[in-house]
Amino acid sequence: MKQIAVLGLGYFGKSILEELLSLNVEVFIVDRDKEAVDAYRELSSNSVVMDILNVENLRKILPETIDAVIIDMGVEAAILAASYCAKLNIPTIIVKAESETLGEIFTLVGATKVVFPNKEAAKRVTPLLFSSTLLSYMPVSGALSIAELKIPDVLIGKTLAESKLREKYRLNLVSIRDQNGEYALCPASYVFNENDIGLFSGNDADLNKFAVVAPKESGYNRIIEKFMRFIKRKDS
């Protein structure tokens, strides 16, 4: 069983912790707020209230076999925590940062991965502003993303094979969501219906071109232009 520690229960730390608690992992918690720690005490392997963090304290709290640490603290505390975790040779040290500059600092002191929650949230939300068919959007890596889209009118009544998604739109259909909200794989013979919602993977620009294939709203061209400018800025 993997062992993961969450140092700091800010919004990001709590969100990660709640996801971890739903998995088959052993979780360790450290925070200076007793009330925050007590809320998860019974669900974790070890929950500690600690004002001052140092190498020796961490050594006592965390097992030598710890697999990863997630750090969500104030800047100075996060720098120290990342440095201490590096000294303890923890293989994976993930730190939340608010800027690229802080991310570089965290990397220098020992973080193996830096995450930017606000930046990632912006990447997910902004595309939704420009298309009525784009329901959700998740960047994966580089220019690759996964998007939940209403099937455009031009494909309704066609089979998956006839749609030629890869050839025409350079996209892959991962699955189709049914009326019960369940996703299922569909064969090449599947016929697209009016209310179908698909989960697609592909290049950001290709996904967003596909997202505006169907709508015939006023300002259609202006929306496309604005959206593509956004994508170009993000890729630059």
What kind of region is each of these model predictions?
Residues M1-S236:
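Cytosolic regulatory regions of ion transport systems
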